[in-house]
Amino acid sequence: MEKTEKRLDGPALEKLGLNPEDIAPATAEERAASDQMRPSVGYWKDAMQRFRRNKLAMVMLGILIFIILCAILIPVFSPYTYKGRTPDVRQGPTWAHPFGTDKLGRDILVRVMYGTRISLLVGVVTMLLVCLIGISYGAIAAWVGGLCDNLMMRFVDLMMTIPSMLIIILLSVVLRDPIKKMLSDPQWNALASIGSGLISIFAVLALFNWLGMARSVRGALLMNRTQEYVLASEAMGAKASWVVKKHLLPNAVGIIIISATGVVPSAIMTESFLSFIGLGVAAPVPSLGSMANDALNGIISYPMNMVYPAAIICLIILCFNVVGDALRDALDPRMRK
């Protein structure tokens, strides 16, 4: 038996006690207003959507991921090593050696990718150390407050007035031999494989790059310090460490991410400069800075030996800077409309 659709007209609706105007179809203006309404989204979901809408940042992120994968996989699957020599000395790009070879017959592509590993390792480790020191220092200053906060922040201001590059160079020279002597002890065999040069770079870079992180974290925590939910937790007897861990730091994650992304390119640039002047990793381990220095002698005849490491350094720093700016725009509440 077929079902027929029966529509109610105006008189029929009035008999039912309904006003026809209340159930009339929506007008074009009402439909347009309804289409503009969107369901509410959380902070992180909104930040991710804003980041994905930044096309330039997505392109740079893809390039950065590609460089990281090449740095990991090419030295693994290549038949050459970073220190292995071949009879082909100063050879141009070929199928066997896409970037050519250097004056000792070593494959430049493998050495550039291995140097990229070193640069990325320096950037990531420095970022982790900076987060550890800066977050702890800023959280203590913000929570304790008063005279202790003033003294701690004045120390940060004093450290920021010191010419960091000069001190970094001096400390790299001073710390190299003590660290090398320490690593000769069998109990430090795990760190000995990293090398005294890299460890000294980690130490000196973390020593001067945590200052901005500490100030950012302190400012974010002070902004949330007087919020009602924090005061309620204190009134209920919550410990200071619990309040900082559960309430204050989670609300400062966006600021921490923004500050951390700025540390990586700065650390990579400083490490490349130190390696360029001979204070980086020890030979024969390649670094992008040391490879650029080695290419200086033949820059007229073999300019590409200088171009390859320099281009990778510039590209990595550019990618991190663009992605960092996009993260700042996405995570900063002041940028949200």
Task: List PLM regions with ranges.
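Gly/Trp-centered helix-boundary motif
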Residues: M1-I135, A139, L147-N150, T161, ...
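Short alpha-helical transmembrane interface motifs in multi-pass membrane proteins
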Residues: E29-E30, I118-V122, Y137, M153, ...
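Short helix-capping/hinge motifs at transmembrane helix termini and TM-loop junctions
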Residues: I74-Y82, A142-G146, L171-K180, S184, ...
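Generic hydrophobic transmembrane alpha-helix motif, especially the helices
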Residues: P98, I108, L129-I133, A142-W143, ...
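Amphipathic cytosolic juxtamembrane alpha-helices at the membrane-cytosol interface
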Residues: R106-L121, V125, G145-M153, L222, ...
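Short, conserved catalytic or interaction motifs in soluble domains
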Residues: G145-G146, M160, S164, D177, ...
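Glycine-rich helix-loop "coupling/hinge" segments at transmembrane-helix boundaries
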Residues: L171-L175, W188-S193, L205, L221, ...
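Transmembrane helix boundary and interhelical loop/hinge segments in multi-pass membrane proteins
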Residues: G219-Y229, A326-R334
